[in-house]
Amino acid sequence: MNNLSLIKELVRAYQGFETYSSTHIRELGLTPVQFDVIATLGNQPPMSYKQLGEKTLISKSSLTGVVERMIAKGFIVTLENPDDARSVLLKLTAKAQKVFDKSFPEHMAYLERAFQKLPAKRLKEMTESLIELKAIFTNPRS
């Protein structure tokens, strides 16, 4: 069976979502990468670069530069890691926490308006299908 049409639609759906989401994030005065970091660190305890990398959608090769630019803009501070002297912990500044408190709920509401165009049952089915599909590619030997 040729799954090319599934692959194309999956990619197009992601690209459509990314465009829709990114447009709003930019209207909020952030880049998508900045929003990802702020949304991940917002209302959370400080975390290491490794933890942040695991929880964001940012490639590991880009993360250091992104964080350094956000430190320079006054969005992130580094703290000593009491559990590992070789690493630092990252935390939002009060300035960035205010950005999170305003932008995160606004963006979630923006996305919710789009998802409300589909019935809850259909969204649940789609979520389950995507989880199954992800498992195929993240556990290919299973």
Residue ranges and their predicted role:
Residues 4-8, 28-39, 61:
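Short alpha-helical elements of helix-turn-helix
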Residues 18, 68-125:
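Charged, amphipathic alpha-helical coiled-coil/dimerization segments
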